[in-house]
A protein has these predicted regions:
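Catalytic-loop region of hydrolases
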Residues: 35-98
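Sec-dependent N-terminal signal peptides
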Residues: 19-28
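Active-site nucleophile loop of the alpha/beta-hydrolase fold
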Residues: 155, 233-245
Length: 271
């Protein structure tokens, strides 16, 4: 009986201990989820690095942060998250190109161009674009950082970019969500960024991937007309042409699908 009582006491203590731990975990979890995520409107962090591009050492700084968007009254209404790579072993950057890179979607983050194409590091993937185990990243020997500084920008509601002012869905759409609205606030943001980093003398380029092709075309016009920023060039990476893609009676989709139909037919023959 004494042994049974000791076992029962041990079970009771173990049960109470578990209940206490569960209570603490629930308390912490409730506090964590009840707190609203706060994103600073204007902040940055700079670190120093070096990499190898085309068998040559390149020293550079990486600046990550957020930069505000203001309304006509000077109130902060939103903030855009960005990553800025700048080569640091160059004495004069007045002739060094500055590139602003955008992905498509239009709701796609800049991480795809950042870690998949032009940044100093890239994901470990095969020739078809699939990840290779063990998963990770590596130095990108094809990065363009050796010849140009790069700013990867996340538009509103992408990545850590957020609307900070409370507004209705209709107000947000009128301000941010549309081809022209997109170009307008991005142009204002770019003008501020170039002023802050003192890069007005630098040659400036835009890179747009997929829908980013449409974005940078509209942005180039907006920059020239309303920000007095004249670009030196625009780079389109597999740009999307939605009018051509969905044009009634067009031949683009049938031509693209033809190879897949042929491969399917050949595979059926061998079954």
């Amino acid at each position: 009986m004494k042994i049974l009582k000791l076992k029962q006491d041990h079970i009771n203590k173990y049960t109470m201990k578990n209940k206490f731990l569960i209570f603490i975990i629930m308390l912490i979890s409730t506090g964590s989820f009840s707190q609203e995520r706060i994103i600073s409107a204007d902040t940055s962090k700079i670190t120093k690095h070096s990499t190898i591009i085309l068998n040559k050492k390149v020293n550079y700084s990486a600046q990550i942060g957020t930069q505000p968007i203001w309304d006509v009254e000077g109130q902060v209404i939103a903030t855009l998250h960005y990553t800025y790579y700048k080569r640091t072993d160059i004495n004069d950057d007045s002739n060094r190109p500055l590139i602003f890179s955008f992905n498509g979607g239009p709701g796609s983050a800049s991480i795809w161009m950042h870690m998949g194409y032009t940044g100093p590091y890239s994901l470990t993937i095969d020739d078809e674009g699939y990840p290779i185990q063990p998963y990770g990243y590596k130095t990108n020997p094809y990065s363009i950082l050796d010849v140009a500084d790069i700013v990867f920008v996340n538009p509103i509601n992408i990545g850590y970019s957020r609307i900070l002012k409370k507004m209705s869905k209709e107000e947000a759409t009128d301000k941010f969500f549309g081809v022209n609205q997109d170009a307008k606030y991005l142009a204002e943001w770019m003008s501020t960024f170039v002023s802050r980093t003192e890069r007005w003398k630098s040659p400036k380029y835009l890179v747009g991937e997929s829908y980013g092709g449409i974005r940078v075309m509209a942005l180039a016009s907006e920059l020239q007309q309303n920000q007095w920023m004249y670009l030196n060039g625009v780079v389109l990476v597999s740009p999307a042409d939605y009018e051509l893609r969905y044009e009634s009676g067009g031949i683009i989709l049938p031509v693209v699908d033809f190879l897949y139909f042929t491969a399917t037919a050949l595979s059926l023959i061998h079954i």
